[in-house]
A protein has these predicted regions:
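Final/C-terminal transmembrane alpha-helix of multipass membrane proteins
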Residues: 253-270
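Juxtamembrane transmembrane-helix termini in multi-pass membrane transport proteins
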Residues: 3, 37-39, 84-127
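Lipid-exposed faces of alpha-helical membrane segments in multi-pass integral membrane proteins
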Residues: 51-59, 82, 86, 90, ...
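A small-residue-rich subset of transmembrane alpha-helices
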Residues: 56, 116-144, 213-248, 256-260
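Histidine-/acidic- and/or cysteine-rich, low-complexity loops and terminal segments associated
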Residues: 3-13, 22-90, 115, 148-152, ...
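Transmembrane helix boundary and interhelical junction motifs in multipass membrane proteins
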Residues: 96-104, 210-216, 228-229
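Alpha-helical transmembrane segments of helical membrane proteins, especially in multi-pass transport
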Residues: 169-175, 194-225
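Transmembrane alpha-helix/helix-exit interface in multi-pass inner-membrane proteins
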Residues: 133-183
Length: 270
């Protein structure tokens, strides 16, 4: 199978849709056929929509790197609510949009041609990120309310990583991970109200992702978001949760051991 056939089978490209009233006018107006009569291909609108989200995630990563470098050497802490909220939104766009691309593309492909399908796809992504934003705010308010002494923040950060690994062994994590994999693809036709359907799909998927990655996200909040190295490490773990093969119990224990080792390393390096 050639590359073009593989892309066409995946729905990423398709034959250019002809326009006009007669065959000669269509070929002249759109250039859809060469002298041999072979039809040209175009990138499908759902693929362009997914590409736009991927570019947005890349821009968010660039901004995350810039923020981390501009706060180099900052001590672990949450900072003001405004600064935390801004940094958290950017980080969620960088980390979570790529893992949601399969669902975004599937929704766009199924809804293409219906009224306001582009708006509905944007609503899905916005709902997904809004759930993560609310989770981040909840972590912020809970952690700022706890009387954590500054002298033991490095110990708290190490414990957070160890507890994130322990959370990976819980039934809640396992059930959420299975649900997350199930909701990554749509099943059946979309309802008539496309925008409302996008909100429901985005909210359900986000809630399953929160249950799947809550331990790592709490650790990220506690460790502080100014450390680019920890952001990349935890982002890789989350991407593996969502897009990798379903882990066995042995792999779950291995993940716990890795996170415990990272917690010890963080405590020693702090």
């Amino acid at each position: 199978m050639s590359l073009s056939q593989a892309l066409s089978a995946a729905g990423l490209i398709r034959p250019t849709r002809r326009r006009g009233f007669c065959p000669a006018c269509r070929g002249w107006a759109t250039g859809t056929a060469d002298q041999t009569g072979r039809a040209e291909s175009e990138i499908s609108p759902p693929a362009l929509t997914a590409l736009a989200f991927l570019i947005s995630a890349a821009a968010a990563w660039a901004l995350t790197i810039w923020q981390a470098r501009s706060t180099d050497g900052m001590a672990m802490g949450l900072g003001s609510l405004e600064a935390f909220a801004t940094g958290w939104v950017v980080m969620m766009a960088a980390m979570m949009l790529p893992s949601a691309l399969p669902l975004v593309y599937d929704f766009a492909r199924r809804s293409e041609g219906r009224r306001r399908w582009q708006v509905a796809t944007g609503v899905l992504a916005a709902t997904y990120l809004s759930i993560w934003f609310a989770f981040g705010l909840a972590c912020y308010f809970v952690l700022t309310a706890l009387p954590l002494p500054r002298a033991s923040q490095d110990l708290v950060g190490g414990l957070a990583l160890a507890l994130a690994g322990l959370y990976a062994l819980t039934p809640i994590k396992n059930a959420s991970e299975a649900r997350c994999r199930e909701l990554c693809a749509l099943h059946g036709p979309l309802p008539f109200n496309l925008v409302r359907s996008a909100m429901v799909v985005g909210a359900r998927y986000a809630l399953s992702c929160v249950g799947c990655s809550a331990g790592l996200m709490v650790a990220m909040v506690i460790l502080g978001m100014s450390s680019l190295g920890w952001v990349v490490i935890l982002a890789g773990q989350i991407l593996g949760y969502k897009l990798g093969p379903a882990p066995t119990m042995r792999r779950r224990w291995l993940l716990w051991a890795v996170l415990v080792a990272l917690g010890v390393a963080y405590r020693l390096m702090a």
